[in-house]
Amino acid sequence: MSNNYQKEIQTKLTKGLLDMIVLQLIGHQSMHGYQIITKIRKTFGIYFGPSTVYPFLANLEKKGYINSEWNLTAEKPRKIFTITAAGKTMLKFTEDSLGLICRTMHSVENAAAATSTVEIAPVAH
């Protein structure tokens, strides 16, 4: 598998889990949008720009999973995002669901490996 293809798969998976990643990040510490973008890049090695991250943030806020508040005391006004109780519940559900998917994939893989390595002895005539 080529490095480009691996990177493409990692990017797709990360983008698919972006809600969970954002909730996880701001669950540990309230952050503004640029901090979230930077943390994702440093943690996953993938850059999602403002045009990707801010709509995710708006959607999470609309669903009640995060709150935002303007910090006007900083050098530059920043919208600070924090996780809500509903966001913590959703994060836990998403983490549990992802764990179940991974366990299921491993059990399917192990079952396939077990059946493919079984050797049937030839019948003597």
Functional labels for PLM-detected ranges:
Residues T11, Y65, T115-S116:
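Short, contiguous hydrophobic alpha-helices characteristic of membrane insertion segments
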Residues T38, A85, L100-R103:
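Generic recognition of well-ordered alpha-helical segments
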Residues K92-H125:
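Amphipathic alpha-helical dimerization/coiled-coil segments
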Residues K63-P77, T82:
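Beta-hairpin "wing" of winged helix-turn-helix
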Residues Q10-Y54:
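N-terminal helix-turn-helix DNA-binding core of bacterial DNA-binding proteins
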Residues P77-E95:
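Basic, amphipathic "hinge/linker" alpha-helix immediately C-terminal to the N-terminal HTH DNA-binding motif
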Residues M1-T11:
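Short, Lys/Arg-enriched N-terminal segment that forms or immediately precedes the first helix
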Residues Y54-E61:
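Short, hydrophobic-biased segments on the C-terminal half of alpha helices
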